[in-house]
Amino acid sequence: MSTTITNSTAERKHSHVDICLNGDVAFSTPTTGFERYRLRHNALPEVSFADITTESRFLGRRIGAPLMISSMTGGYSEAAELNRQLAETAERFQLPLGVGSMRQALEDDAYRDSFSVVRRHAPTIQIFANIGAPEVAKGLSDKDLHIMLEMIRADGLIIHLNAAQELFQPEGGTDFRRVLDNIADIAAKLPVPVIAKEVGCGISGAVARKLLEAGVQVIDVAGAGGISWQKVEEARYTRRFGSDTRFSQEGIEELLNWGIPTAACVVEVDALRPRTAGGRPFSIIASGGIHSGLDIAKSIALGADLAASAGALLRALHHGTLEATITAWLQDLRASMFLTGSANVAELQNNRPIGDTAKQP
């Protein structure tokens, strides 16, 4: 692989973090949709707040809370320190952790330490490798898959589906043919689960069904309402070229805010249970605009097995408040569980919220 390509990939990874921290890249509309729902208050909770546990299970393993520190970064020099801090925090709270896209580590082994650092600092938690749909479309060799999994002793592989991001990315790859077939091939050969993840535009029930039938075991809906990766790439494009004339002025605003709200995605994907994939169980991760323990609680009550956050936790890490932020979120979650009479996460998942499209008891 040429130095020009690897250097440009590293530059892109670095600029992504910079823009997410300093740019105005949140969705204008739609919101996550969580504001449409109210958790169902229980005036007789019949549970002691002191006895409430946030512990849960994900892919057969105990986790400290139904929260994943989602895929953020890797593949450039400063990423190793960010990933070290994320890994140490995830280990402390016993939370699953996803790394950023590992494309750069496949292109240049000099960047592999920016990923492998996570396992050195988080020896006991679930850690997930990550690669994008454009690389899947081109075809990943068995060697590529082995390198990614072994690099972090991964408990699974995240495949991120990022069509809208690639559409806006200056150097984006927009040939998404063969992605589903190649996902099926990967899922069939890997010894670990495959997670299909959007990056902010959401996964509908119809698409989730196809992914599950292809052998995917976890759907991370990654809906609209948090960071718009279209806006991140638009910022990179205008930095480079000064203005964007690729789209009409009338259409670009809607394209920059394109996506299905996170809450709507969770409801649609949860509705597939248990009819999809021959009745085989699957897990749902709610991500895209998770900013509090109330968002986590609503995600679980709508049917997700856990929530995940990247942007909000990256900002907390940048400000030195990551551990305090997670602690506060988990206290929010425990308060929500107490007020709904849910002693554990499974009980919260059966406490359907009040809302226009929420399942009613």
Curated annotation (Swiss-Prot):
The keyword Transmembrane helix does not apply. Its main location: cytoplasm. Its EC number is 5.3.3.2. SUPFAM superfamilies: FMN-linked oxidoreductases. One of its GO terms (biological process) is isoprenoid biosynthetic process. Gene3D superfamilies: Aldolase class I. InterPro entries: Aldolase_TIM, FMN-dep_DH, IPdP_isomerase. It catalyses: isopentenyl diphosphate = dimethylallyl diphosphate. Substrate binds at residues 12-13, 101-103, 165. One of its GO terms (molecular function) is oxidoreductase activity. It is found in: Cytoplasm. Belongs to the IPP isomerase type 2 family. PANTHER family: ISOPENTENYL-DIPHOSPHATE DELTA-ISOMERASE. HAMAP family: Idi_2 (MF_00354). This is Isopentenyl-diphosphate delta-isomerase. It comes from Chlorobium luteolum (strain DSM 273 / BCRC 81028 / 2530) (Pelodictyon luteolum). The gene is fni.
